[in-house]
């Protein structure tokens, strides 16, 4: 209950933010009621619009929903995938003031130049290209002013509401909503501590070094030019790994480069349970020297050996068309599972398993459009619902990992059609 009472501790700024949030949600509720009167259920749309309007925490919450199809209904997951984390840029004069305050002295004491126009502007931070006093090309990630107090007010309100839902909404007392919000709170507060992101980058780099891996790199962290609120990193030049035409400028064998990237990602996951949890076309590059570049480590994941073992059993069942293996894998992932009827669970999974098998087979036959977000989200949500009905609690990392693997499979079918990522998964473990 400590978190409940902590959620009531807000200052004037927090109260103002909560009033603003209440106004936005009230406005969207009125629009929703009008829609319902006309026979249209637009709750996911109105919620997404409210999240985008409020920015910061709510956009991150939308992204959490979008990335966790095993936890949320399909219509919300699909709508939140449209949640745009693009906001009006902070004026350069404000960026300059923040950097000078964080590093001390004048901007020119630390950088030869900083590009006034940002590379990217999101709800939590803004990114500018720059050149260090030593002539090195870097990017500077700068937190938006007052973001920490905004997040605190938002998170307190969200947690307070989640506790009320669990206490008074029928059927939600055992849903674990408040626990999930509490984990979200921990995660997002870590994301605004750029020391944590710097640590994540260097941890991934240590994994690469421990494997003797020279095919991949992460950007160098310039600790002397970084604080909790600004992060200065080596600037990478190259092409997104999914842009086959562009990467041919840097790699004579794009197929091998892609399989190298997959091998590295799988191997760091299997060796230590640590993985980059947001690998997409924008965060995975082929650099000018032909190596693979992993960027943006604001979101990482960690899984236990038990979850990894369960995931491998699950994928084996998927590749062999055996629901009993899939059931065994899901049971293995839940350390609290006791007395689960494996045969009944396997039988219950048959329908949803056939849907996933059909999707995977279509992708393997070259029908890349079959890997549709809406269908995949619905399938993963069904897995979760059936698991809950059978007394299982599927870890949140499961949906994230399965979705990542299936999207990797889509990239593979574009550039390396002879490879079956699910069937050949062991080949990517070094």
Which residues fall in each region the model found?
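N-terminal accessory/targeting segments that precede structured cores
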Residues: 1-126, 149-177, 412, 419-420, ...
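Helix-rich C-lobe and terminal helical cap/extension of kinase-like folds
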Residues: 12-15, 39-41, 236-257, 287-430
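Short hinge/gating elements
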Residues: 39-47, 68, 79-86, 141-147, ...
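Core structural elements
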Residues: 57, 121-124, 224-232, 376-380, ...
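ATP-dependent phospho-/nucleotidyl transfer catalytic cores
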Residues: 74, 81-88, 100, 152-153, ...
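Glycine-rich ATP phosphate-binding loop
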Residues: 129, 136-144
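Conserved beta3 strand of the Hanks-type protein kinase catalytic N-lobe
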Residues: 130-131, 279
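Hydrophobic residue at the +6 position relative to the catalytic HRD Asp in the kinase catalytic loop
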Residues: 282-286
């Amino acid at each position: 209950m400590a978190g409940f009472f902590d959620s009531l501790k807000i200052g004037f700024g927090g109260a103002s933010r909560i009033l603003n949030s209440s106004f936005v949600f009230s406005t969207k509720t009125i629009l929703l009621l009008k829609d319902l009167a006309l026979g249209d259920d637009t709750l996911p749309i109105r919620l997404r619009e409210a999240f985008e309007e409020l920015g910061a925490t709510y956009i991150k919450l939308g992204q959490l929903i979008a990335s966790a199809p095993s936890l949320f209904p399909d219509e919300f997951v699909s709508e939140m995938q449209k949640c745009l984390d693009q906001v009006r840029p902070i004026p350069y004069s404000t960026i300059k003031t923040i950097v000078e305050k964080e590093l001390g002295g004048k901007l020119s004491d630390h950088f030869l130049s900083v590009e006034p126009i940002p590379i990217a502007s999101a709800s939590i931070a803004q990114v500018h290209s720059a050149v260090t006093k030593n002539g090195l090309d870097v990017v500077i990630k700068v937190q938006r002013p007052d973001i920490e107090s905004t997040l605190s007010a938002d998170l307190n309100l969200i947690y307070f509401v989640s506790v009320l839902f669990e206490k008074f909404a029928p059927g939600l007392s055992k849903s674990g909503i408040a626990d999930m919000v509490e984990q979200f709170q921990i995660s997002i507060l870590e994301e605004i501590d750029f020391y944590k992101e710097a640590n994540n980058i260097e941890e991934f780099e240590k994994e690469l070094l421990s494997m003797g891996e020279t095919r991949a790199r992460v950007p160098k962290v310039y600790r002397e030019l970084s604080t909790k609120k600004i992060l200065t990193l080596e600037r990478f030049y190259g092409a997104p790994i999914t842009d086959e035409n562009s990467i041919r400028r840097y790699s004579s064998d794009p197929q091998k480069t892609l399989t190298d990237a997959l091998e590295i990602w799988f191997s760091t996951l299997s060796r230590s349970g640590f993985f980059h949890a947001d690998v997409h076309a924008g965060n995975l590059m082929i650099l000018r020297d032909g190596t693979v570049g992993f960027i943006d480590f604001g979101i990482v994941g960690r899984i236990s050996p038990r979850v990894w073992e369960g995931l491998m059993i699950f994928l084996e069942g998927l590749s062999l068309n055996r629901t009993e293996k899939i059931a065994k894998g899901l049971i293995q992932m839940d350390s609290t599972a006791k007395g689960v009827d494996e045969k009944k669970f396997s039988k219950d999974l048959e329908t949803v398993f056939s849907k996933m098998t059909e999707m995977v087979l279509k992708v393997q036959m070259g029908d890349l459009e079959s890997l549709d977000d809406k269908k995949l989200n619905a399938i993963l949500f069904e897995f979760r619902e059936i698991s809950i009905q059978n007394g299982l609690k599927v870890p949140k990392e499961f949906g994230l990992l399965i979705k990542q693997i299936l999207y990797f499979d889509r990239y593979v079918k574009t550039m390396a059609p002879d490879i079956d990522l699910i069937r050949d998964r062991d080949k990517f473990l070094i």
